From Swiss-Prot:
Family to which this protein belongs: Belongs to the NRF1/Ewg family.
Annotated segments matching region Disordered: 36-57
Protein's UniProt name: Nuclear respiratory factor 1
PTM field: Phosphorylation enhances DNA binding.
Residues with PTM Phosphoserine: 39, 44, 46-47, 52
UniProt source species: Mus musculus (Mouse)
Length: 503
């Protein structure tokens, strides 16, 4: 009995010794892992403690370009933005500065939301004190936004004034020499960042014009309504009244939008003072970007080329030419075109803000055939017609015709609805083939060429007959400048929503 007790005691001692040894080994491994993590952090090229990181020549490096130089010359806020942009380029990030203030604001909101989610995940998973600090040293109200783990967030807020002071001093060291200002007019800036007049919103223009008038006229108040106070450069077709409200006639409002009229006021003022160079910030950069940007749907596809879709691993869809197997275009979204399309010659370029502003296309000598087999594909037919309508063309003739071959009633309804929405008052829908014969027999309006021309105002009368035959539907469009964004078509300042009718 005694022997058994001694044996059991020895066995327990052995187990305890093994456990202690295992704990020592775990402590050693944990220490090694922590040391490795710290070493990895110290090896980061963006760490301020790293001797290889030097921001003394941040604006003199190859990362600096015309954009950063333009920003740096705009003042403290622009200097801070230029330093941030140059830092990102120095670290080989494939991004560019967004010069459009409206788009830049949307990007800021989206990225801050993404940063907050990433930071929450980091602090929870890693268990470290971490924050995100965003600063724009504008006076008198600097932007100082900080969020993250407590108490580090509170500590940073406590030293807000010190951080801002040190940042302004650091930026002042890198700021370029101030240029002599010989202009009577202020540069166009939004929140301290230069902006082109064509990218200013209506609200920004309404707030800017009174300030511009102070510089131009030298008076503290514009003197609205007094003809003696009206500048000689003020447009004749715009009343000399407070720009916060549009007091023009209805005819003038229909002809020119209020936003465009406000831009004309600013342009006239700067042209009068000989400072047109201040109207267009980053103009050279934007011109180069637009020249190399092409739309994702089609770019100079040969006439009568039949293409089919092919899904790529990255989620995009390629248009493969039938017969040769060559890739003619890559789509960001499979819904942009139906399954099989015969594409006429298209040359399409996008503007910087992602919208389209071109003349209606003329598909000269070509035909775009959309093969639809279900009523639900009518939306695709509408989208494709819209893309064809805004595809860029150098010049177009009056009465240009777009031919669409539709194989479903819903698609015919949808395309005719879009035609009604987009054609001007003098426009017409032209039917040919069996459809024209059927409608012509009913109405007696078929001409010698076998075509039936229907005014847009009579659309509701004949829409039910559009899909009875399988012949193509020709939509004759007069050239008109328009802007299409998503599913809305803007004409003369009024939005027309595209309605899709299904069976």
């Amino acid at each position: 009995m005694e022997e058994h007790g001694v044996t059991q005691t020895e066995h327990m001692a052995t187990i305890e010794a093994h456990a202690v040894a295992q704990q020592v080994q775990q402590v050693h491994v944990a220490t090694y892992t922590e040391h490795s993590m710290l070493s990895a952090d110290e090896d980061s090229p963006s760490s301020p403690e790293d001797t290889s990181y030097d921001d003394s020549d941040i604006l003199n490096s190859t990362a600096a370009d015309e954009v950063t130089a333009h920003l740096a010359a705009a003042g403290p806020v622009g200097m801070a933005a230029a330093a941030a942009v140059a830092t990102g380029k120095k670290r080989k990030r494939p991004h560019v500065f967004e010069s459009n203030p409206s788009i830049r604001k949307r990007q800021q909101t989206r990225l801050l939301r993404k940063l907050r989610a990433t930071l929450d995940e980091y602090t929870t998973r890693v268990g470290q004190q971490a924050i995100v600090l965003c600063i724009s040293p504008s006076k008198p109200n600097p932007v100082f936004k900080v969020f993250g783990a407590a108490p580090l967030e509170n500590v940073v807020r406590k030293y807000k004034s010190m951080i801002l002071e040190d940042l302004e001093s650091a930026l002042a060291e890198h700021a370029p020499a101030p240029q002599e200002v010989n202009s009577e007019l202020p540069p166009l800036t939004i929140d301290g960042i230069p902006v082109s007049v064509d990218k200013m919103t209506q609200a920004q223009l309404r707030a800017f014009i009174p300030e511009m008038l102070k510089y131009s006229t030298g008076r503290g108040k514009p003197g609205w309504g007094k003809e003696s106070c009206k500048p000689i450069w003020w447009p004749e077709d715009i009343p000399w009244a407070n720009v916060r409200s549009d007091v023009r006639t209805e005819e003038q409002k229909q002809r020119v939008s209020w936003t465009q009229a406000l831009r004309t006021i600013v342009k006239n003022c700067y042209k009068q003072h000989g400072r047109e160079d201040l109207l267009y910030a980053f103009e050279d950069q934007q011109t180069q970007t637009q020249a190399t940007t092409t739309h994702s749907i089609a770019h100079l596809v040969p006439s009568q080329t039949v293409v089919q879709t092919f899904s790529n691993p990255d989620g995009t869809v390629s248009l493969i030419q039938v017969g040769t197997g060559a890739t003619v275009a890559t789509l960001a979204d499979a819904s942009e075109l139906p399954t099989t399309v015969t594409v006429a010659q298209v040359n399409y370029s996008a503007v910087a803000d992602g919208e389209v502003e071109q003349n209606w296309a003329t598909l000269q000598g070509g035909e775009m055939t959309i093969q639809t087999t279900q009523a639900s594909e009518a939306t695709q037919a509408v989208a494709s017609l819209a893309e064809a309508a805004v595809a860029a063309s150098q010049e177009m003739q009056q009465g240009a015709t777009v031919t669409m071959a539709l194989n479903s009633e819903a698609a015919a309804h949808a395309v005719a609805t879009l035609a009604e929405a987009t054609l001007q008052g003098g426009g017409q829908i032209v039917l040919s083939g069996e459809t024209a014969a059927a409608v012509g027999a009913l109405t007696g309006v078929q001409d010698a060429n076998g075509l039936v021309q229907i005014p847009v105002s009579m659309y509701q009368t004949v829409v039910t007959s559009l899909a009875q035959g399988n012949g193509p539907v020709q939509v004759a469009m007069a050239p008109v400048t328009t802007r299409i964004s998503d599913s809305a078509v803007t004409m003369d300042g009024q939005a027309v929503e595209v309605v899709t009718l299904e069976q």
